[in-house]
Swiss-Prot record:
InterPro entries, alphabetized: E2-binding (IPR014929), ThiF/MoeB/HesA (IPR045886), ThiF_NAD_FAD-bd (IPR000594), Ub_act_enz_dom_a_sf (IPR023318), Uba3_N (IPR030468), Ubiquitin-activating_enz (IPR035985), UBQ-activ_enz_E1_Cys_AS (IPR033127)
Listed Pfam families: E2_bind (PF08825), ThiF (PF00899)
SMART domains linked: E2_bind (SM01181)
Lineage: Eukaryota, Metazoa, Chordata, Craniata, Vertebrata
Protein name: NEDD8-activating enzyme E1 catalytic subunit
Gene Ontology molecular function: ATP binding; identical protein binding; NEDD8 activating enzyme activity; nuclear receptor binding; protein heterodimerization activity; protein-containing complex binding
Biological processes, Gene Ontology terms: endomitotic cell cycle; mitotic cell cycle; negative regulation of DNA-templated transcription; protein neddylation; regulation of cell cycle
Regulation of this protein's activity per its record: Binding of TP53BP2 to the regulatory subunit NAE1 decreases activity.
Length: 462
């Protein structure tokens, strides 16, 4: 092929060569396979080696399971998700579902390679599925332009493996809770067939991590919640009266000016995916920054602060996605021992990787199957319990709803998410636990957006 050929001619020539290869090798009709297509996978599945699982027996059945049966769910179709989808599709996985609630922004195009400029504004899940179904013969990627909370346990139970490429701790905690809720126990013994393995990957700049979670058997997300850094929040006094950073100006407009001015109508919430909303925040932030001689407010920074965007580097995404896809392959085929169970990656200065076994917490609120013990004085106010649930490093709840059984009736002590109930139960926050009728050994049921399950707490008076 001459070096001077235009890219379009090169592309057509490559397509012609591929068509010729399929004709010579002998295509397999409507299957989309040709001789030698899966040779790179067969090397791992049809022969043994020094790293294969001791109980693994090479055969053709494992490849057929990948091609025909194994169903994988990918959560997230962003920078990490695009890499994951590509890796899985090219590794023989054909039954893939993908969930993503976001639409494509022009800033995504530099690293989320399944998208093109013409796709801006369209759902990521749908475009990613279209691209892979068109590019990879016989691959069936099913898109879901939804939140993960839109699906019930029946939906998640159909998958053999779930792999996450999320940028949200809340979403991770929710899917973790969902998979734990799928577990079945017989006389206290876990039924292995009810386990849906979770492979979780995350990146931030030049750092990343990947982990293998076998719900009910290994450490879950809640067991290691302290490993996730808390969200950065700026003091309100600094934002309002002494801004020093461009982020302070953006947060001021987001938290104070937007609710006050309601620029798009009464009750219209700020939507980080709406360009008009971001533009309004950006303009107002520039105005406030000029009042304090602060430089550096840009549209991209505004979008990042409003949406809590995590810095992304394409090469880090590629490394972590490769690790996650490898773990999916190992678990699906049982050909190799999976990661046990946490890997960290860092290439800020040189290249560093490390693996260790994250341990289960005996009193994990998600996977221990035991009520959590909490200690308070009878004179403590319900507000103190609420503060504990939200501020505790091991719980980090967002908007806990507290209920208890009193005199044989289920009573809501506080519920924040419904305005009418919040107003009715707000006076309870200033009451003591004794005044509310709670007793030593009382069980409190707490619901929160971080988990689909209700978490039980046992109250002990001190």
């Amino acid at each position: 092929m001459a070096d001077g050929e235009e890219p379009e001619k090169k592309r057509r020539r490559i397509e012609e060569l591929l068509a010729e290869k399929m004709a010579v090798d002998g295509g397999c009709g409507d299957t989309g396979d040709w001789e030698g297509r899966w040779n790179h996978v067969k090397k791992f599945l049809e022969r043994s080696g020094p790293f294969t699982h001791p109980d693994f027996e090479p055969s053709t059945e494992s490849l057929q399971f990948l091609l025909d049966t194994c169903k994988v769910l990918v959560i997230g179709a962003g920078g990490l998700g695009c890499e994951l989808l590509k890796n899985l599709a090219l590794s023989g996985f054909r039954q893939i579902h993908v969930i993503d609630m976001d639409t494509i922004d022009v800033s995504n195009l530099n690293r989320q390679f399944l998208f093109r400029p013409k796709d801006v504004g369209r759902p990521k899940a749908e475009v990613a599925a279209e691209f892979l179904n068109d590019r990879v013969p016989n691959c069936n990627v099913v898109p879901h332009f939804n939140k993960i909370q839109d699906f019930n346990d029946t939906f998640y139970r159909q998958f053999h493996i779930i792999v996450c490429g999320l940028d949200s701790i809340i979403a991770r905690r929710w899917i973790n809770g969902m998979l734990i809720s799928l577990l079945n126990y017989e006389d206290g013994v876990l039924d292995p067939s009810s386990i849906v393995p979770l492979i979780d990957g995350g990146t931030e700049g030049f750092k990343g991590n990947a982990r293998v979670i076998l719900p009910g058997m290994t450490a879950c997300i809640e067991c290691t919640l302290e490993l996730y850094p808390p969200q950065v929040n700026f003091p309100m006094c600094t934002i309002a009266s002494m801004p020093r950073l461009p982020e302070h100006c953006i947060e001021y407009v987001r938290m104070l000016q937007w609710p006050k001015e309601q620029p798009f109508g009464d009750g219209v919430p700020l939507d980080g995916d709406d360009p008009e909303h971001i533009q309004w925040i950006f303009q107002k932030s520039v105005e406030r920054a000029s009042q304090y001689n602060i430089r550096g407010v840009t549209y991209r920074l505004t979008q990042g602060v409003v949406k809590r965007i995590i810095p992304a580097v394409a090469s880090t995404n590629a490394v972590i996605a490769a690790v996650c896809a490898t773990e999916v392959f190992k678990i699906a085929t049982s050909a190799y021992i999976p990661l046990n169970n946490y890997l960290v990656f860092n290439d800020v200065d040189g290249l560093y990787t490390y693996t260790f076994e994250a341990e289960r917490k005996e009193n994990c609120p998600a996977c221990s199957q035991l009520p959590q013990n909490i200690q308070f004085s009878p004179s403590a106010k319900l507000q103190e319990v609420l503060d504990y649930l939200t501020n505790s490093a091991s719980l980090q709840m967002k908007s806990p709803a507290i209920t208890a059984t009193l005199e044989g009736k289920n009573r809501t002590l506080y519920l924040q998410s419904v305005t009418s109930i919040e107003e009715r139960t707000r006076p309870n926050l200033s009451k003591t636990l004794k005044e509310l009728g709670l007793v030593d050994g009382q069980e409190l049921a707490v619901a929160d957006v971080t988990t689909p399950q209700t978490v039980l707490f046992k109250l002990h008076f001190t």
